[in-house]
From Swiss-Prot:
GO annotation, cellular component aspect: ribonucleoprotein complex; ribosome
One protein family per Pfam: Ribosomal_L34
Family per record: Belongs to the bacterial ribosomal protein bL34 family.
InterPro entries: Ribosomal_bL34
Keywords, in A-Z order: Ribonucleoprotein, Ribosomal protein
HAMAP family assigned: Ribosomal_bL34
Domain of life: Bacteria
GO BP term, example: translation
GO molecular function, one term: structural constituent of ribosome
Annotated protein name in UniProt: Large ribosomal subunit protein bL34
Keyword Ribosomal protein attached: yes
Amino acid sequence: MTQRTLHGTCRKRRRVSGFRVRMRTRNGRAVIRARRKKGRERLAVY
């Protein structure tokens, strides 16, 4: 039987691309700002 090869980890996603991580740096805040301007429903992963 074949195995699923992609196992996403929630903790890593949160640490890398969560909202609070984005807000820490200037570039991260720019990402949030751009997504707000575009009208994204989800600004960050978590």
